[in-house]
């Protein structure tokens, strides 16, 4: 088990003082550099290929998932037209383009419209389950697999 010492505490302090605790935005911009540096150094320290700072919320989880899938500028991510703002904002924060697809009678992503919205730049889809109703994941996953979409 790895123990956190003075060196690690100093690095954490730098991140906290940067007032940028999460990886939102363009990591090449100065205000995110402490976060990016900490993530890289922490990953090396624990022997991992990557590490991401995040809060425990769903917005951060979406952002982290997109980063983990290597979604970035120029990529398109299909999202349902009826969802919480975090779905599209996570895509924007990754530098990608949210493409809004219609919903069906269950208020979730319409699989047919999802397939119509696919372009060569489409890299991912974020289905959202709404008001206790699940999206048609069998159809959505089948379409995604057919078009090599994450």
For the regions a language model picked out, list residue spans one by one:
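Conserved PLP-binding active-site segment in aminotransferase class I/II-type PLP enzymes
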Residues: 1-59, 63-68, 72, 145-147
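PLP-dependent aminotransferase-like
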Residues: 67-150
């Amino acid at each position: 088990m790895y123990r956190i010492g003075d060196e690690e505490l100093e690095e954490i302090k730098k991140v906290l003082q940067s007032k940028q605790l999460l990886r939102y935005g363009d990591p090449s911009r100065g205000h995110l550099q402490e976060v990016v540096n900490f993530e890289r150094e922490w990953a090396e320290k624990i022997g991992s290929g990557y590490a991401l700072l995040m809060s425990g919320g769903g917005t951060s989880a979406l952002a982290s998932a997109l980063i983990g899938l290597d979604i970035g500028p120029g990529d398109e991510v299909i999202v349902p037209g009826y969802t919480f703002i975090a779905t599209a904002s996570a895509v924007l924060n990754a530098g990608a383009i949210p493409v809004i697809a219609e919903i069906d009678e269950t208020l979730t992503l319409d699989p047919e419209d999802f397939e119509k919205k696919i372009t060569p730049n489409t890299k991912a889809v974020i289905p959202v389950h709404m008001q206790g109703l699940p999206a048609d994941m069998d159809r959505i996953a089948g379409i995604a697999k057919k078009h090599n979409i994450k």
